[in-house]
Amino acid sequence: LLFATTACAATSPAETEPDNKTSVPAPTGPINVVASLNQWGSLAAELGGDDVEVTSIVNSTNVDAHDFEPKTSDVAKLSKAQIIVANGAGYDSWATKSMTKTTNIVSAASVMGAVEGDNPHLWFSKDARSSMATAITDAYIKALPSKKKAFQKRLKAWQADEKSLETWASEFTKSHSNLTYAATEPVVYYLMADLGFKDQTPKG
């Protein structure tokens, strides 16, 4: 009888040991996205649709992000973001300097291999816009896998619109030869280069 009781206890550990495994719920939207600049925030919003909530810290083109000082409320928004969309290249360092290693940051400079000291006005570059659209979409899919098809559909729609813009720019360049420009600031460099303009700004 003693042997039978002992054997019974030894063969039923599931009844005496608690199950500590818990299931992790699948993430649900919308994704909390914070962009440093409205230029990238508008792109993030278009690609995310109803599956994201996008806040842009700098909303006005009259504000120089170089000199911008975020308020406490701005820092709080950035710290709570699931995804931060930044420009980088020293243009908006305030947006990422206090973030942890786990913060998902999509940076135009990182995507394009630009560093501080390079022309930071990357939103004017067709290559930067295209690469950022893909990078942002990838970040969305990672954060909310259940909406993968919706994100991919929006990306394709954006790419179609961008292609139309690039086609127009290409036709413009073909019909206007030997175009030059001069500028006191490097803001429009990428845009003018994409349109085939040659920079004739005096050095020094």
Where on the chain are the PLM-derived regions?
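Extracytoplasmic metal-acquisition and chelation regions
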Residues: 8-204
